[in-house]
Amino acid sequence: KQNTDYIDTAIRFIQTRYDSPISVDDVASACGVCKEYIQRLFRKERDTSIKEYLIKYRIEQSCKYLINTDHSVAMVAELVGFNDIKYFYMKFKEIVGMTPIQYKQSQGGLNRE
């Protein structure tokens, strides 16, 4: 297998299961390689860790929910795989630059909290 095949498999795995708990071990198993190898390869090819990629992907998905649904922030956090609302808020603000509520309002999303 080419290195890019492993990365593609890892990304597909994350993108189809982001709403569930995912560990680096799970990603490695899906790719059929050891954890250390996929971590090293992912960082080399994507310039980020698997964990950070997963978090950013979850935040991207949460933005879609915030704009296109009237779900509460807590519900959105749960739908995208965050089981800790404080951690979701912290990561959302770190990545997007504003809170989920501010983002929803700035994008004209439905205003329910």
Each PLM stretch: what is its role?
Residues 30, 79-80, 95:
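Residues within the alpha-helical elements of helix-turn-helix
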